Swiss-Prot record:
NCBIfam families found in the cross-reference section: nuoB_fam, PRK06411.1
BP terms from Gene Ontology: aerobic respiration; electron transport coupled proton transport; photosynthesis, light reaction
Subunit structure: NDH-1 can be composed of about 15 different subunits; different subcomplexes with different compositions have been identified which probably have different functions.
Gene name of the record: ndhK
Chief site of localization: membrane
Localisation: Cellular thylakoid membrane
Name the UniProt record assigns to this protein: NAD(P)H-quinone oxidoreductase subunit K
Taxonomy, superkingdom: Bacteria
Sequence similarity: Belongs to the complex I 20 kDa subunit family.
Transmembrane segments: none
Originating species: Nostoc sp. (strain PCC 7120 / SAG 25.82 / UTEX 2576)
PANTHER family documented for this protein: NADH DEHYDROGENASE, NADH DEHYDROGENASE [UBIQUINONE] IRON-SULFUR PROTEIN 7, MITOCHONDRIAL
Binding locations of [4Fe-4S] cluster: C58, C59, C123, C154
Reaction(s) catalysed (UniProt annotation): a plastoquinone + NADH + (n+1) H(+)(in) = a plastoquinol + NAD(+) + n H(+)(out); a plastoquinone + NADPH + (n+1) H(+)(in) = a plastoquinol + NADP(+) + n H(+)(out)
Entries under InterPro entries matching the protein: NADH_UbQ_OxRdtase-like_20kDa, NADH_UQ_OxRdtase_20Kd_su
Length: 245
């Protein structure tokens, strides 16, 4: 027997140890049986999604239109549930406030695994128009719970909701039992940082003491036809000179 010294370590025949784990079961991700079970399990889940409706604002009106006979979302196997313990999908539609945040997190934690989240509407995703000057609006529901599908719009149409459900079904169809522990909700948490621009408070509680209450702006007095007070005229000229200088 002649030994070939040119063979590398990878080309040499590996010695089989009868005590160790069999090679055929070391990597079960490509196993035919588990692949079939995955497909069957995923098909059953994506064909019978039970959503928990968490509507807080006008976006929920569009979802209510989706329940009607015109769009008929029952064809996707969606059955709305009133209890989070019987739901595997939560659809947040509308503005989420700081006072409402603990209740939303509690509902999400009561849902059994696997569970999914659809963020519906601009107010849910980024805070929307309420994120400008509202101190109580949450700037994105992904700061509270992980989101699987983002559905932008103000509000999104029922056709867009159907498209989001189809995308979620495709995502469920690609799940694997071997990877399920690695893509749990806690491991795919996503959050965005929002750069808030500080502005002076509008409501200071000193409206009765404001200067404009006693001395209206010059433009307003000229538009109404009232004579401009000398003190106001003097202050306006002083401000203009300060800006020029």
């Amino acid at each position: 027997m002649v030994l070939n010294s040119d063979l590398t370590t990878q080309d040499k025949e590996r010695i089989i140890n009868p005590i160790e784990r069999p090679t055929i079961t070391q990597d079960l991700s490509e196993n035919v049986i588990l692949t079939t079970v995955d497909d069957l399990y995923n098909w059953a889940r994506l064909s019978s999604l039970w959503p928990l409706l968490f509507g807080t604002a006008c976006c929920f009106i569009e979802f209510a239109a989706l329940i009607g006979s015109r769009f008929d979302f029952d064809r996707f196997g969606l059955i709305p549930r009133s209890s989070p313990r019987q739901a595997d999908l939560i659809i947040t539609a509308g503005t989420i406030t700081m006072k409402m945040a603990p209740q939303l997190v509690r509902l999400y934690e009561q849902m059994p695994e696997p569970k999914y989240v659809i963020a519906m509407g601009a107010c849910t995703i980024t805070g929307g128009m309420f994120s400008v000057d509202s101190p109580t609006a949450v700037r994105g529901v992904d700061k509270l719970i992980p989101v699987d599908v983002y559905l932008p719009g103000c509000p999104p149409r029922p056709e867009a909701i159907i498209d989001a459900i189809i995308k979620l079904r495709k995502k469920i169809a690609n799940d694997s039992m071997q990877e399920r522990s690695l893509i749990r909700q806690t491991h795919r948490f996503y959050s965005t940082t929002h750069n808030l621009k500080p502005v002076p408070d509008i409501l200071t509680g000193k409206y009765m003491q404001s200067e404009t209450r006693f001395n209206p702006p010059k433009e307003l007095t000229e538009a109404i036809g009232l004579p401009v007070p000398p003190a106001l005229l003097t202050s306006q000229t002083q401000k203009e000179e300060q800006k020029r200088g």
